[in-house]
Every structure is written in C-alpha cells, then in structure tokens.
C-alpha cells in the first residue's frame, strides 16, 4: 500500500515578549509652606497699614489691603519675601491710602532711631488717657524732656488730613528750652482761657492724628513757624535738621483721634 505520511502537529509559535513599561517617575517633592504666623508677624511690623495675607500653593503669598505710602507697600512685600519658604509675593492687591500724618511720624521715629537716639523718650501726658477727643474738647498735654537730656523740646500734631499744628514752640509759647526732665504744660481748659494763653480744641477734619515730641540737645529750627502748615514739607525740613544738627536727640509719637461729638 502506498505509504501515507503521518500528519504533523502545527508549529507552536512562542508568545511574543511583552515590553516592560518603565516605572513612573517619583512625584516631585512637596515644597514646604511658609509659616502663617511668621507672615502675619512680618506684616504687623509694617506701620500705617492694614494688610491681609493669603497663602497659596507653592509658597506663593498674595497681599491685599492698604498702606499709607508706596514705600510701605514695598516694605510689606520685602518683609514677607524674607520669611522662610516664601517663594513669591503678589502685592497687586495692595493700594495706597494716603495717611501723611502717620507716615510723617514714622519717618521721624525711624530717623532718630537710625541716628542712635537717646535711651529714654520725651513724655507726653494727655488729659484724655485714651487719646480720643470729641469736637470742641480741650487738648492739654503735660510734656517733658527725657531724663538725662536737656535742650529743646518740639511738640507737633500731624494729621492724616495733611496738616501739622505746632504746639511748641509757637507765638504764645515761644520758649521751648528745658533742662533734663523739665516739664511744660501745653493748652488750658475752658475755665482757664485768657488773653495771651493758647488753647487747643478738637475740630474738623476729624480722624486719627499723631502727636510727635522731639527732644534735641541743640535747637533744630530757627525762629518760629506758623501755627499750621502742610505736614509733608515740614517733616522734610525737620528730617534735614535732625540729620544736620549735632547732639543727642529723642522722639516719642502718641496716636490720638479727633471725632465728631455723638
């Protein structure tokens, strides 16, 4: 019989090798977030401002609010940027709400501190301990030179309306020379009003104001100035005098507020 070939089993094809996918990359490290308390402390050190901070992912801090001057906006940005783990600061939400009285007082305080001001400050005692004066209230100040510093005492009120009032020296109280610790009373009550004595009363425009007492071993300004003048120009003049006049100096700022009578 014819020879019949045995059927062969089908060839077995080995399975194709499956390519192994590379492992996924590790997630990027999580950047540490700034400490909220540290950011708030940095903002609290910026004077004449009301600023809020919003912490966003990636160390971004967004600032909103107001400051009295462009320089204080920059100061807020720089102080927050210096906080650990702050990556960027967005100050686009900050606006300038001009407050020339507050800003002028801060400039004077900082100038005296930078020049190594005296260890003790002048004294400013108010007849309203809370510093709040309503329309037509009489303003009385017990001012004094610092202990250990005799010379000349200058007392001004800077308002956020942009004016400065010179309480000492002025035409009716021209002598501002005092010994160390020497005291002087500025202003009188209604019953004490008389010819030749200056009285000071709260009046519009209302709002915050800043009483500034500057003590200097030597005279700072020649002669007497008008009782009222623009604050910005006067602060520049006084800063120049502080920088150019030798001798010890000290400053105190007392915030007060003038309000309409309820």
Can you name each region flagged by the protein language model?
Residues 3-262:
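Secretory-pathway glycoprotein ectodomains that are cysteine- and/or Ser/Thr/Pro-rich
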